[in-house]
Amino acid sequence: MAAQDNNSAAAAVSGFFKSIGGFFADFGTAVVKGDAFVKLSLIWMGAGYAKRKQYVKAVLMTLLEIAVIVFSVKFAMQYVPKFSTLGTVKMEKVFNMKTMKSEFNDYDNSFTILLFSLFSFVVWFAAAVVWFKNVINAYALQKMEEAGKHINTFKEDLRSMTEEKFHITLLTLPVLGVLIFTFIPILLLIFIAFTNYDQQHMPPTELFSWVGLSNFINLFGGGGLTSTFGYAFVRVLGWTLVWAFFATFTTYIGGILLSLLLNSKKTRLPKMWRTLFIVTIAVPQFVSLLLVRNFFSNGGIVNTICHSIGLTGFLRSIGLVSTSYIPFLSAPGWAHVMIILINIWIGVPYQMLIATGVLMNLPSDQLESARVDGATNFQIFRKITMPYLLFVTGPALVTDFVKNINNFNVIYLLTQDVYTTTNQAMASSQANEVDLLVTWLFRLTQDYYNYKMASAIGIIVFIICAVFTLVAFNRMIKGDKEGTYQ
């Protein structure tokens, strides 16, 4: 089975590269075998359409070509030539003899150079794809003309975009949105990780420059004796994975068990209990987590009660605490456990609702057959109920794990202004023991303006999430499992 998975993955990768190779092969064929107007399309993009009397398309492609040229000359050339250095002229005030005033010079802004250069590269790449495709289409029109086939008018092409090609029309705006608002920012994040963009190199007053892999070297502990990022990264990554595991599976298993309990015929007033558990969903996390943080703070109501009943003194006597309060959210071990427990309280009701919906659709004939055959409740749960739940909720389980790797709210709202690290190495890297990679990243950008290291960490988070998701889904969808539950 593993060999089949590897073969399917290899086939997918091979098919991807073959499609790219086929695209360039079609372009080469069009250039070699095309007539003069197809070859002229290499220079004038509307030539092939004009020859085949598709004048509207010819005008549109010509206007597109002119727009790309104007964009390149008027906009891109202001930034792309400076991309290799990200600017050399710093901001400073100079005295203007004409106006007799101090004015800012014509300085470089490293961030705008990087951003608009990347934007220009994306535009050029898209224009290149359109250019290649335009030549291929011009050759296709030539072959249709030679074969005596009907060539659509512009009106017929428009009609096809609302009929057989309507899916392309619907996807155009979403794809543009993903390209502009997702792809370009991710590309910017990746490139910033290879610069020294931080508080000491903050545009527009200062310039930043390329530093290669030095940020990743520092992150993985190769930055020398003065670098503590490697030390902090290992510990933050370890806690992130531990947190994601327990936060995912405690709520998943807890939700299933709670759903089974509420669906049991022996449970009285199940609707009332279900409503009480759903209350935690109804209250926004921003409110509930801040309240819980205050309850469990060093001077909160829970510590007051524990001190009154003597629990704090007992824990001090056996060495579990060394202060006059229980450090629920202010000491490493205590905070880790409390965060996971509080997350169970928040997350179990969600999983309970999901599990309830799945259990309502569990094949009753299978359950009845198992009981007739003498299976116990535990055997039914292990052999029928749980496999069915895993099959239906497996994708949600994977996404929950990835979501918990990036679960900013729970960690930040529970520990912000409450937890302070005493580990100097962690503090030097602007991290603490309860940070996830995403909260560490946030603190680096918002509090310390260390965008270079935050970008490097962001890339690591993306790689972890992407690899886990691809591997997990690949394992999950292998074989024909759906037939088992038909």
Q: What residue ranges belong to the model's regions?
A:
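Residues in the short coil linking paired helices within alpha-helical repeat scaffolds
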Residues: 54-55, 450
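Transmembrane-helix bundle segments that line or gate the permeation/cavity pathway
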Residues: 53, 75-91, 122
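N-terminal signal-anchor/first transmembrane alpha helix
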Residues: 2-25, 35-36, 43-47, 55-58, ...
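Perimembrane loop-to-helix junctions flanking transmembrane segments
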Residues: 83-105
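A structural signal for multi-pass alpha-helical bundles of membrane permease subunits
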Residues: 76-82, 166-486
